[in-house]
Amino acid sequence: MHKHIDNYTYLTQAPVHHVIITMAIPTIISMLVTGLYNIADTFFVGKIDTQATAAVGVVFSLMFFVQAMGFFFGHGSGNYISRELGARRHENAIKMASTGFFSSFFVGVIVLILGEIFLTPLSLMLGSTPTILPYTEDYMQVILLGAPFLTSSLTLNNQMRLQGNAKFAMFGIVTGAILNVILDPLLIFTFGLGVSGAAWATVIGQAVSFVILLLMTRRGENIAIHFRNFSPSLQRYKEIFYGGSPSMMRQGLACIATMSLNLAAGAYGDSAIAAMSIVGRIAMLSFAVVIGLGQGFQPVCGFCYGAGLYDRLKEAYRFTVIIGTSFLIVICIIGWIISGSLIGVFRDDPKVIAIGVVALRWQLCTFPLNSLILASNMLAQTCRKPWRANILAAARQGLFFIPLIFILPAHFGLLGVEMCQAVSDIFSFTLTVPIVVYTFREFTREAAERKTKV
């Protein structure tokens, strides 16, 4: 509810820039805090040694996979809910909310069980070296306990956000993240748990977020979760697939990309793995604002598409891209200037810093391109353009990155590893532009058809 205006009226009639910023701010805060608690693990574990830092980076690829499951059900069910609320079909939205939530929780339990059974082979598959393996196993066996909480929390978070209730989602995510940051130094150093202490801090934070988000579904205009509304059907899972497969593709490929990066960097030692892990965390934190802005755009996009308000949808997209690009240009300039100090905060190792600075500066060069890439992916995903959304989701860390991480190091050595993401971003941007142009031309035709029917 926004100043006594219901969500439908607010999202389809209030000034676009005001709506997007209002929707985006809670999401940006959630993304930033989540990014900070990911960085907190790296920061505090970095005080142990380089191998511990590298181990967290290795397990991070598993976290991408678990997040992929949560985003699959969260975006899949949430995008459907958004369109159905925009079209005033509330009963469909209510059943989808519970179906998405319980399905994601069950998948998290399966990941937990299989991960614990195959702990050592999984650690090696993710890119762990013999010197890193003991740290990786200590960290991973605890992190897996949080899989059901993480998948279902991400589902609830995205469902609430796509209903236009991002403030409720923010409260749950932020509380868990802050608790994680507080617990990290206590469990790692005070209680002497080392790298497993960082994992316990993360799991406890995820469990708290889960409980709060579940309680938040009963507040405001949120759709409450009830097992009686759990209605699995082929049609509902088909809708979840259409809306969620781009997110699963994006996160799943991020998992494979991180594994591939660890393997490629591992050829140059543990310092290279640690450096690339640190750069990845910094990049993720930098993108938090742009992703949050894009997620603020999504409920506007879903409601407007469901209501047939194509001009408003186009205006919202343009605003999102311009603001996001402007922000990333500023980050690019600042990051270039302080890159050495930034890497040094996490690991005061000259070799790690030297590798990290080069990799970070390469990525900074193409940062501004990512606003259009991300917004276009969210546009296609929310408006049920699954194949385009999947292609765009696969581009940055799959279609281009994975082949490049094997090709570039073969020709340029360590520099090939460091420049890989930047080269992938250029190719992704080149692919995105014609796809988004075609999509808006399609919207123009759809608008004309709606007018003809009226």
Give the ranges of each region predicted by the language model.
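Helix-terminus/linker motif at the lipid-water interface of multi-pass membrane proteins
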Residues: 32, 36-54, 123-130, 186-193, ...
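N-terminal transmembrane alpha-helices
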Residues: 11-43, 47-48, 64-76, 80, ...
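Transmembrane helical elements of multi-pass membrane transporters/channels
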Residues: 22-41, 142, 153, 176, ...
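Transmembrane alpha-helix boundary and packing residues in multipass membrane permease domains
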Residues: 27, 31, 43, 60, ...
